[in-house]
Amino acid sequence: HKTIFRYDNPPLSAIQKLRLTPRNDINQKILNWDIDIKGCSIELDTFDYHDNRIHLCKTKDDINEIEITSYGRLKIKDTNGIAGEPTSNIPYELIKFMSSDYTKPGKKIKTLVSYFKNQFKKENLSDLEKLNLLSKKILNEVKYLKGKTSTKTSAEDSLSLGFGVCQDHVHIFLASARLLGFPSRYVSGYLMLNNTNIQEASHAWAEVYIENLGWVGFDISNGISP
């Protein structure tokens, strides 16, 4: 993973907080890992509250470019999108009550959730089946189209508009899933694309806590889930 920052004028001072080191857990093991930095020096190597490894680096004097490269090898277990039981110190039950301006449910979101509550009463569905139906419904209602929304667009607004991108799909999904009683969270990263190593933007998807499975991933924009 390589990131390059270029400046027209050298910054007087800049600090980067890097979270570029994978975690060792039940689904993956680090075989080797390193971070190369040009234009900065590492000032601190520590861990955050969630046990993610963090590097703080400070710019050197009179630089116009910073290049940060992280690389290594991992042994990964294929879990089909199921991350498993929580490793965070925050009780997962609390996440169903967490909200923000992006995921605050309005009239449109509440109408969507009411529709599903009525559907779920009629059918004997597992939680996984319910959430897959929700994901498909959102993608059908909100067509993927760039340029119609921004990083400031809320779930309610994008659902009303009928267009959006991955972050909009996730915000709608989170708002709806939480109203349905499911703890759920926003995940950002990269979508693996064939025949390309350079990506212009990051990707977003959701994870929902399902009893007896743990955290389960739902990529609403691409219709990918267990």
Task: Enumerate the predicted regions with their spans.
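Linear, non-domain "peripheral" regions
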Residues: 1-118
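Short, flexible coil/turn micro-motifs enriched in small/turn-prone residues
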Residues: 46, 157-159, 184
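A broad, low-specificity signal for short, low-complexity segments enriched in glycine/proline
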Residues: 27-35, 145-147, 164-170, 178, ...
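A broad, structure-centric signal for solvent-exposed, well-ordered loop/edge residues
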Residues: 27, 44, 151, 193-194, ...
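A generic short-segment signal for beta-strand/edge and adjacent turn/coil regions
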Residues: 1-6, 25-26, 34-43, 135, ...
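Secondary-structure boundary elements
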Residues: 74-76, 83, 93-164, 172
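Hydrophobic/aromatic-rich core segments of domains that either
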Residues: 15, 168-226
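Generic structural "secondary-structure junction" signal
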Residues: 13, 20, 37-39, 61, ...
